[in-house]
C-alpha cells in the first residue's frame, strides 16, 4: 500500500501543493551535475518522504545518507546537504569538509536550507573557514500534506520556542505557509484567532498581503472562506488526556510518524521477531479511513463484524454459481490484507487497553477534568513517582492537574517538585523550569476558572454513546475537547456570543474581515449553514493549531464536518501532530 496518501478526494487541491514541492526539490537536485550524495537532516527525511518517494530520489542517481557528526562515506564528487537551519548541523557539515580536505579529497558541496537560509548558520560556516567552498540555496518547504484534510508545518518545537524561549520565528513560518496557500487558492477574507501566537500570525499574514499581495485575477474566486487560528496554550487540557479514537490510540501507544507506524513484525503476524516493519496509515487504506475516527471500542466490534461476514462469504463460495457472484467475492478478498493488518493492530492495542494501569490512568484523567477530587489524584501521582513510572506519564498527569486547577498549592508544588528530582535525577530541573515558565506546571496563585469553562461549554457529556455518537465527546469517551467546542462556536456564530468565556482563557482574541479582499459568495453566511459555492462544492474553513493538534481533535472536526446541516469542509493545519507524551517531551531537557 502506498505510504503517500493519494489526496484525490481532498476538499482543496493539496496534491498541487505536494507536486510543486516535489518539482522544486527535483529541480534543485538536477541542478547539481554528476554523481551526488544527498545527506538529509534525519528530522527532515520523514517530511521529504511524504513529498517524494525514496524510489523516485534513487531514480535521480542519488546516494542517500542521514546527517550525523561522522564523515560522509561516499565515492560521489558532489555532496548535497538538505538541512533545517540548526547551528549544530553547521558544525557537522564543516567537520565533514575539513575531514575531506585533510584527506585531499576533492568534492563540491551544496547546502540547501529548509525552508530558508539563516545568517547565524552561514556565520558558523564562515568561522569554520568553509563558507567559500559551499554553494548555499533554499528549499522553501513550508508545509507537508499529511492526508486529504491535514497539513503539517513540521514545527515540532514551536510551543516550547514561543512559551519558554521567547523565540517567535515559527510564527513567521506559519504565516508564510498560509500565505503560500492563498497564492494557490485565493485570499481568505474572514479571520478568527484566539491566543497570543494566533493573533500575531494574523497580523503577520495581513502585512504579507500588503507587502506581497495575492492577485485575485491570477487565482480566481477564493476557495477558503474562513481562517480560524488557535493557540495550543488556550487548551492544554485536551492533549494531556488519553485519546480513545483508533488513530489517536495508535499514536498514544505506538507513535505515528509521517503517516506510518513502526512495529515489530511479530505484531503483524510474521514469524520473525525483532524485525521492524512500517505500516502506512492514511486515507488510501479504505478500512482505515472508515475506522480511524471511531472510538476504539467500536473499531473492535466493526472488525469482528467484517471478519464474520467474510467468513460467511467464504463458506458460501462452494454454492456460488454465477461469474458475477464470483467477481464480488474476489473483490472482497482484495480487502483481506487491510483487514488482516487492522485486526493485528487492534489486537496489539488491546494488550495495552486491557491493563489495569491504563484504566486507572483514564479514571484519574476523568477525575481531574471533572474537577471532582484533587486529593485522590495527588496521591495517585505520588504513587506513580514512588513506582518510578515513566517521567513523561507522571508529568502529563501533573500538567493536567495544574492546568485544570490553575496550579498546585505551594506546599504540594514544592514537595512534588523535590520528589521528582530525587526520584528521576536533578538533571530534570531544567525540564521542570521549562514547564513552569510555560505556565503548565506552576504554583496556584488564584482560584481556577475551569469549572465555569467546563459548565458553560458543556465539556462533560454524560452517557456518551460511542457507537452512535451525537456529540464530539465520543473521541474522549465523555469529554468534549475544549479546542473543538471553541472552533464549533467560531464556525457557527463567531466569537462575539462567547466573549465572557474567551476572556477566561489564555491570550487575546480577534475577529476580522480582511477588507478590500474579494470573497466567495458564502463568506458572509458563517452564522449558520450556507448553500456552499455555486458549483456545488461546500465552502472551506481552514483551522490552524499553533503548538500542535491531536488525532482525536482531528477526528472530532471530521465528525463536525460530516454532520447534516454543516455547510463546510474543514481542513486542519498544524505545527505538528502531538499527543500528551510528545508535547511534554519537547519541554524535556537534560543537563550536559
From Swiss-Prot:
Give a GO biological-process term: vesicle-mediated transport
Where in the cell? Vacuole membrane; Prevacuolar compartment membrane
Main location per the UniProt record: membrane
| Keywords noted in UniProt | Acetylation, Membrane, Vacuole
Q: Which InterPro entries match?
A: Sec-1-like_dom1, Sec-1-like_dom3a, Sec1-like, Sec1-like_dom2, Sec1-like_sf, VPS33_dom3b
GO cellular component, alphabetical, reads: CORVET complex; HOPS complex; protein-containing complex; vacuolar membrane
Q: In which tissues is it expressed?
A: Expressed in roots, leaves, stems, siliques and flowers.
Q: Which Gene3D superfamilies match?
A: 1.25.40.850, 3.40.50.1910, 3.40.50.2060, Syntaxin Binding Protein 1, Chain A, domain 2
Q: Could you tell me which residues carry N-acetylalanine? A: 2
Domain of life assignment: Eukaryota
Q: Which Pfam families match?
A: Sec1
Query: Topology versus the membrane, per the UniProt entry?
Result: Peripheral membrane protein
Q: Which family does it belong to?
A: Belongs to the STXBP/unc-18/SEC1 family.
Q: What binding partners and quaternary form does the record give? A: Core component of at least two putative endosomal tethering complexes, the homotypic fusion and vacuole protein sorting (HOPS) complex and the class C core vacuole/endosome tethering (CORVET) complex. Their common core is composed of the class C Vps proteins VPS11, VCL1, VPS18 and VPS33, which in HOPS further associates with VPS39 and VPS41 and in CORVET with VPS3.
Q: What does this protein do?
A: Involved in regulating membrane fusion at the tonoplast and the prevacuolar compartment.
What protein name applies here?
Answer: Vacuolar protein-sorting-associated protein 33 homolog
Amino acid at each position: 500500500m502506498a505510504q503517500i496518501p493519494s489526496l484525490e478526494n481532498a476538499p482543496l487541491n493539496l496534491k498541487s501543493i505536494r507536486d510543486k514541492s516535489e518539482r522544486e526539490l527535483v529541480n534543485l537536485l538536477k541542478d547539481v551535475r554528476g554523481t551526488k550524495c544527498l545527506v538529509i537532516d534525519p528530522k527532515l527525511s520523514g517530511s521529504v518522504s511524504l513529498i517524494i518517494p525514496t524510489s523516485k530520489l534513487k531514480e535521480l542517481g542519488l546516494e542517500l545518507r542521514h546527517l550525523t557528526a561522522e564523515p560522509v562515506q561516499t565515492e560521489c564528487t558532489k555532496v548535497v546537504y538538505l538541512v533545517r537551519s540548526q547551528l549544530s548541523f553547521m558544525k557537522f557539515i564543516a567537520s565533514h569538509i575539513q575531514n575531506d580536505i585533510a584527506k585531499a579529497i576533492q568534492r563540491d558541496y551544496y547546502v540547501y536550507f529548509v525552508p530558508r537560509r539563516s545568517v547565524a548558520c552561514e556565520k558558523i560556516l564562515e568561522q569554520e573557514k568553509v563558507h567559500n567552498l559551499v554553494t548555499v540555496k533554499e528549499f522553501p518547504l513550508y508545509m507537508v500534506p499529511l492526508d486529504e484534510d491535514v497539513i503539517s508545518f513540521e514545527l515540532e518545537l514551536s510551543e516550547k520556542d514561543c512559551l519558554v524561549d521567547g523565540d517567535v520565528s515559527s510564527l513567521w513560518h506559519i504565516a508564510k505557509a498560509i500565505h503560500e496557500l492563498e497564492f494557490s487558492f485565493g485570499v481568505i477574507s474572514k479571520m478568527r484567532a484566539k491566543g497570543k501566537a494566533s493573533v500575531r500570525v494574523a497580523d503577520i499574514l495581513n502585512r504579507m498581503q500588503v507587502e506581497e499581495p495575492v492577485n485575485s485575477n491570477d487565482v480566481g474566486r477564493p476557495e477558503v472562506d474562513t481562517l480560524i487560528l488557535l493557540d495550543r496554550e488556550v487548551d492544554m487540557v485536551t492533549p494531556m488526556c488519553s485519546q480513545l479514537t483508533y488513530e489517536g490510540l495508535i499514536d498514544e501507544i505506538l507513535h505515528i510518524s509521517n503517516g506510518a507506524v513502526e512495529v515489530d513484525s511479530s505484531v503483524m503476524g510474521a514469524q520473525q521477531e525483532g524485525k521492524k516493519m512500517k505500516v502506512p496509515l492514511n486515507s488510501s487504506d479504505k478500512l482505515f479511513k472508515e475506522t480511524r475516527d471511531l472510538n476504539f471500542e467500536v473499531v473492535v466490534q466493526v472488525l469482528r463484524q467484517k471478519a464474520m461476514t467474510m467468513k460467511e462469504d467464504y463458506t458460501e463460495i462452494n454454492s456460488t454459481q454465477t461469474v458475477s457472484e464470483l467477481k464480488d467475492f474476489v473483490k472482497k478478498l482484495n480487502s483481506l490484507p487491510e483487514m488482516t493488518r487492522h485486526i493485528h493492530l487492534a489486537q496489539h492495542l488491546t494488550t495495552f487497553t486491557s491493563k489495569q494501569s491504563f484504566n486507572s490512568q483514564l479514571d484519574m484523567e476523568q477525575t481531574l477534568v471533572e474537577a471532582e477530587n484533587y486529593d485522590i489524584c495527588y496521591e495517585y501521582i505520588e504513587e506513580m513517582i514512588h513506582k518510578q513510572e515513566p517521567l513523561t506519564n507522571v508529568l502529563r498527569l501533573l500538567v493536567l492537574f495544574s492546568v485544570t486547577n490553575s496550579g498546585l498549592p505551594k506546599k504540594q508544588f514544592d514537595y512534588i517538585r523535590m520528589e521528582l528530582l530525587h526520584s528521576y535525577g536533578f538533571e530534570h530541573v531544567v525540564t521542570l523550569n521549562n514547564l513552569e515558565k510555560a505556565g503548565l506546571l506552576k504554583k496556584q496563585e488564584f482560584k481556577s476558572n475551569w469549572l465555569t469553562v467546563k459548565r458553560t461549554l458543556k465539556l462533560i457529556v454524560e452517557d456518551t454513546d460511542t457507537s452512535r455518537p451525537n456529540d464530539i465527546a465520543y473521541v474522549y469517551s465523555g469529554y468534549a475537547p475544549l479546542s473543538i467546542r471553541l472552533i464549533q462556536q467560531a464556525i457557527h456564530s463567531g466569537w462575539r456570543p462567547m466573549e465572557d468565556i474567551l476572556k477566561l482563557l489564555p491570550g487575546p482574541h480577534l475577529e476580522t474581515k480582511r477588507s478590500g479582499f474579494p470573497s466567495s459568495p458564502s463568506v458572509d453566511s458563517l452564522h449558520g449553514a450556507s448553500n456552499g459555492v455555486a458549483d456545488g462544492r461546500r465552502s472551506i474553513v481552514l483551522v490552524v493549531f499553533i503548538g500542535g493538534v491531536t488525532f482525536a481533535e482531528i477526528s472530532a472536526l471530521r465528525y463536525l464536518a460530516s454532520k447534516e446541516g454543516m455547510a463546510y469542509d474543514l481542513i486542519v493545519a498544524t505545527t505538528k501532530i502531538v499527543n500528551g507524551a510528545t508535547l511534554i517531551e519537547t519541554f524535556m531537557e537534560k543537563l550536559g
